[in-house]
């Protein structure tokens, strides 16, 4: 059975296992999410559910989206995501998806938008090697060779160059759920996940599990 939920990254901390070893964990406020729309093969050509997360004031929502929520009979939500599901018949519009969907020990994939780093050079962005920093060298952190001059007289596509770093959709695979607190809608995931604190993330079953 596929599992998926939208959440908000709270931050990182550490817990101790039964042997006293330190485990770094990320705290995520996951759900409750509400099913806003159900899509089926008959109506849309594929099976999926559209899920909303996070409360939102009416003045911040445009008229078409307000109508979309009104049709579903649910309160306004800040984030909408669509999840492909094989068991879509088990869901109805208005159903809540809570953090206890997952269990301790589950392997999950976490998706989010990575932290933006702005414009960065090749050393930070691509882990390129730098030149000598002393002894008369004038080559320190420059990009280096970008291609031949007369032939082919251009820089090849996909050449690793300076540019905007971060702020991209990123997924970390095969993380472990170490603790769940359903009364607080909190889930603790072993290791780090993409994005800044308060960033929106999506937790799914691991594709490798």
Swiss-Prot record:
Keywords: Ribonucleoprotein, Ribosomal protein, RNA-binding, rRNA-binding. PROSITE patterns: RIBOSOMAL_L3. It holds the Pfam family Ribosomal_L3. The keyword Ribonucleoprotein applies. One of its GO terms (biological process) is translation. One of its GO terms (cellular component) is cytosolic large ribosomal subunit. One of the primary rRNA binding proteins, it binds directly near the 3'-end of the 23S rRNA, where it nucleates assembly of the 50S subunit. Belongs to the universal ribosomal protein uL3 family. Part of the 50S ribosomal subunit. Forms a cluster with proteins L14 and L19. This is Large ribosomal subunit protein uL3. It comes from Clostridium perfringens (strain SM101 / Type A). The lineage of its organism: Bacteria, Bacillati, Bacillota, Clostridia, Eubacteriales.
């Amino acid at each position: 059975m596929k599992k998926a939920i939208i959440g908000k990254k709270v931050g990182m901390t550490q817990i101790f296992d039964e042997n006293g070893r330190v485990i770094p964990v990320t705290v995520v406020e996951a759900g409750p999410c509400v099913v806003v729309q159900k899509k089926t093969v008959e109506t849309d050509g594929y099976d999926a559910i559209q899920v909303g997360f996070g409360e939102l004031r009416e003045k911040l929502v445009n008229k078409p989206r307000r109508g979309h929520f009104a049709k579903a009979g649910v309160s306004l939500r800040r984030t909408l995501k669509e999840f492909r599901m094989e068991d879509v018949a088990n869901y109805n519009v208005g159903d809540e998806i809570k953090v206890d969907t997952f269990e301790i020990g589950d392997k999950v994939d976490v998706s989010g938008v990575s932290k933006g780093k702005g414009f960065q050079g090749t050393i930070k962005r691509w882990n390129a090697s730098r030149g000598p920093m002393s002894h008369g060298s004038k080559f320190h952190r420059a990009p280096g060779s970008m291609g031949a001059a007369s032939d082919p007289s251009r820089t090849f596509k996909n050449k690793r160059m300076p540019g905007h770093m971060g702020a991209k959709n990123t997924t970390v695979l095969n993380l472990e759920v170490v603790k769940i607190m359903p009364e607080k809608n909190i889930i603790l995931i072993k290791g780090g996940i993409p994005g800044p604190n308060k960033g929106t993330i999506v937790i799914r079953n691991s594709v490798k599990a």
